[in-house]
Amino acid sequence: MRLHALKLPLILLNPAITRVPVRVLRSLNRSGKRALSSLETPGAGRWRALKLAKAWLDGELITRHRGQWVINSFLPPFPGKAFDRLFENLLSGRHLSPVSAFLAVTSECPYDCWHCSMKTRAGGERPTADWLRLLGELTDLGVSVVGFTGGEPLTRPDLPELVAAAASRGAAPMLFTTGFGLDAPLAKRLKDAGLWALCVSLDSHVPEEHDRGRGHRGAFDAAVAALRLSRATGFYTMSASVASCGYVEEKRYLPLYALARSLGVQEFRIVEPMPCGKLKDADSDALLTPAHVDELRRFHVETNRKGGSPKVCAFNHVESPELFGCGGGTQHLFIDAAGEVCPCDFTPLSFGNAFAAPLEPIWLKMNQAMGDNPRRHCFIQRHHKLVQDFAARSGEYPLPPELSCQVCEQAGSEPLPDYFAMITAGKGAGK
């Protein structure tokens, strides 16, 4: 038995971790708010739940960071306030409170990345007060993880204040950066503000290749320096690479992973190029094939099974139909620099502007339009041509709410991903 497989019993026997989930699940079972009885009584329901949990965690590496357990950056660390919020929100009766929200707090960026999803969106930068109000609405809505992105979020002088606002209200704040502009004094201010995790973009172990892909000379050196500083400051430290076809076919992720390990990175993230932003009109050759996806999923599982560091987090594995699927608009939301509320940063469907209207009705509209439940497949990968047809006719990007709802209606619903199918019906869904 692998050593890290023994961690799960230790976690489940820790009352600091299980106290709130057990209390919430018992309360929900008594009130009948959720069909959770099969998970709380002996028999086949519990066995199915344990079987799926085992299959999921078999490909994950649970690690410790500053006294907390971390599965991966999709979930908050535990025990902790943000983790407890996941379960306490179930008691509120709110319709599918979002687990996470990513905020593009600026569109300003000194880089020109080949895959940028923000290109063609409106630019600008809202004042501090607007974002502080919005952070209050997000945490009232039940968000557990708040990610600050851009543009380059480090260009905002008030970033520590925004981080502190999220942390003080019980969320786990994360920062996504190129590393540009990060120095020791700023890192300390972010740490004091409550930043939990820091993710730095790093696409290649070859400096010239990384600089070329990011459109900025010195990008590699800035990224490496930021990763070292992140570890020294005590953040949960992640690197993130965008996987081109050549990245997979030539196994460039292997020397990049070795570099990340040498820098003390704790999580090695791999994201697919998406048909949006700069790539919205790209042909299929720019996107990964099913064979590429299978290769990255294999790397995720096999590397994590070995128990070394860093753990691998390939999005196309975590968000696969066999696990959690696509939670854009039902478990996750994205707000761009202009305030447009979208399912994720890759899906240019706006359901309202959070600087012009209250957030909760916008969230509910988006949640219902996206089908009320997580989808088995990535929405933008499946329906980018439909989105582009609407964008070409309307000349708007992201699409306004009325057109976004029409896109969702034409896209239709999908069966639940296997995890959620098990929760609601005690069995997996079809492909």
Q: Across the structure, where does each feature detected by a protein language model lie?
A:
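Radical SAM enzyme [4Fe-4S]-AdoMet core and its adjacent flexible, acidic
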Residues: 1-30, 193, 203, 208, ...
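Local cysteine-cluster metal-coordination motifs and their immediate loop/turn environment
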Residues: 108-118, 343, 376-385
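Flexible mid-to-C-terminal extensions adjoining Fe-S/redox cofactors in radical SAM and related proteins
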Residues: 53-54, 346-431
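Conserved alpha-helical substructure of the radical SAM core
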Residues: 28, 41-68, 75-189, 193
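Hydrophobic faces of well-ordered beta-strands that scaffold small-molecule active sites
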Residues: 101-103, 146-148, 173-175, 198-200, ...
